[in-house]
Structure formats: structure tokens, C-alpha cells
Amino acid sequence: MKLMIASDLHGSAFYCRQLLAAMEREQPDKLLLLGDILYHGPRNDLPEGYAPKEVIAMLNPLRERLLCVRGNCDTEVDQMVLDFPILADYALLYAGSRAVFATHGHHYNTACLPPLAKGDILLHGHTHVPAWQEFGSGNLYLNPGSAAIPKENSAHSYMMLTDSGFAWKDLEGSIYHTLALDCSNCG
């Protein structure tokens, strides 16, 4: 499966359009959104092109191609206007033989780990900072950064997961990091 992974749109129609243009170029089987879809939250400035109703109108027609987890800014009210589920705290996926625990990052993160076996992957957004680091027993922590409000001078970005591994890209599609799926250290 070819999976596109993005996080933290925070209601930006401007960056949602760019993400969906990247989706059109990439042609993934699914788009995994790691939370904070419509609301910007009290700690963030309004993102460029803040228009949650436009984001709703862009995402609802794609409901069959979307997988989502709940972010700390996502609420039951958001779920009422979206035609796809967004309120799960996490999703379990697979990248080759490795389990991927996908979550937003405000509950489960490297400081508060979910149950992970040797070689499993923790994937979350929330920080708005792209990340790829090994920890524990061959585990990986991965973060796509933010499509709309990147922090620490990072790019507006997303990730791709293919059979060969992960690639971090800016919204124009330029690759700035790759990580091969090497399971020699996996369970």
C-alpha cells in the first residue's frame, strides 16, 4: 500500500489545497491525517488561508481515501461536519513486517509510549516538527511535521510510505529525507 501521511492542517484551506495537489501527484491509496484538521487551537496563530468550511468541502468528497486519528484540537463538533471518522485516538497499521502505532502525539509520544514490540514504529504529529529517530529496541519515532503551521524552521510537509520505506517531502514534492524499511533488527 502507498500511504500519504500528513498532520496539523489546523483549518488552512490554503495548505489543504496544496496537500491535495500533492496527493494528486503522488496517487496514494490512502491519506492518513494525524489530527488537528479544522481548528487552529489557542496556542497557534491563524494559519494562512484559515477557512475550516473550505477544508471540510475539500476533504468530505475524499472520505473513502482518508484515515484519521484525533488531535488535541479535534472535537465532536468537528466530527458532526466531517463525513469520515476522526475521533480514534490511534490506528494500527503495518509497514512491511513492522507495526505502526499512528496517533496525534498529545497522549502517546516518546515520553509516554504506547505498548510497542521490538522494531515497532511510533508515528505522530502534534509537534509540527518533522522527526525520524531510533529509540528503544530498534523502534522508530517518525513525525511528518505540519502541512500548515511548521515549527523550528521546518518545511510545510508530509510523508510517503511505500514498500521501500518512508520519504519526507515539502508540499511541492521535493524530498528532504528518506528512511529505508530495514527489518534486520525487527522482532
Please describe what each predicted stretch is.
Residues 3, 21, 140, 178-182, ...:
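Catalytic phosphate/metal-binding cores of nucleic-acid and nucleotide-processing enzymes, i.e., regions
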Residues 6, 70-72, 102, 124, ...:
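Alpha-helical architecture
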